[in-house]
A protein has these predicted regions:
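Extracytoplasmic/periplasmic solute-binding protein
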Residues: 1-22, 37, 63-67
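Extracytoplasmic/secreted proteins, especially bacterial periplasmic and envelope-associated proteins
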Residues: 3, 27-35, 55, 64, ...
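Loop/turn elements at helix/coil->beta-strand transitions in domains of secreted/extracellular proteins
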Residues: 41-44, 62-67, 100-104, 128-134, ...
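Structural recognition of the beta-strand scaffold that forms the well-ordered cores
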Residues: 66-71, 105-108, 120-122
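A ligand-binding cleft/hinge motif common to bilobed small-molecule-binding domains
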Residues: 72-98
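C-terminal lobe and pocket-closing loops
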Residues: 78-81, 110-205
């Protein structure tokens, strides 16, 4: 039932905590509450929650759920695995014919939103500062490296020009039935607003 939450929470009109250190519940959060109750009452969702076993099973061969709100990283790292009838760890292959691999596709949602990201942190006091710097710069700033990450993992990486190049190329995802989902992400990403993020989001969301 909570898949759609980030569409609302990422499009609020103000941060969670105001200048007086007072928690403010945005109208958009209450719209999500109202919609969730309505959809639950009408049976539009399966009453499961993110990451629980029912939610995961609903994404597989026996699932009856029409669709899911997801992150870019979740497509390959979570949805793909859940789609397989025989998991890779049990000898299954990531290929058409194993469960519903190849049956999914990505479509544009009602609003652009983000769901976390992939982070890299360095330890304070490291005696390998230059090496750490090179690793971080390569993974986060080197266009060729980031394009390769996208091509290998299907995730959306931190290079606008690189993602636009992949979007206009013949790149395709076998898991997504041959779709170039990066083309859709490249269109949606510029519409994401980060102006109301705060240090309280992780706890309050």
């Amino acid at each position: 039932y909570d898949d759609s939450y980030r569409v609302f929470s990422n499009n609020v009109s103000a941060p969670w905590v105001d200048s007086n250190n007072k928690i403010v519940i945005d109208d958009n959060i209450m719209k999500w509450v109202d919609q969730t109750k309505k959809y639950t009452d009408k049976g539009y969702n399966n009453k499961s929650s993110l990451w629980d076993s029912t939610w995961a099973a609903d994404q597989g061969p026996s699932g009856k759920v029409f669709g899911f709100f997801y992150s870019t990283w979740g497509i390959n790292f979570t949805l793909l695995g859940n789609s397989l009838a025989t998991p890779v760890k049990e000898g299954g292959k990531e290929e058409v014919g194993n469960g519903i691999y190849g049956d999914y596709a990505v479509c544009e949602g009602p609003q652009s939103y983000y769901w976390g990201g992939t982070w890299i942190c360095a330890a304070a006091g490291t005696d390998n500062a230059n090496l750490v710097k090179d690793v971080m710069k390569t993974l986060c700033c080197d266009k060729a490296t980031m394009k390769k990450i996208t091509e290998d993992t299907q995730d959306y990486t931190n290079t606008t020009s690189g993602m636009n190049e992949i979007a206009s190329s013949n790149f395709k995802s076998d898991f997504l039935g041959g779709q170039n989902h990066i083309k859709l992400f490249a269109k949606s990403a510029p519409k994401i607003s980060m102006k109301n993020i705060s240090s309280y989001d992780q706890g309050l969301n």
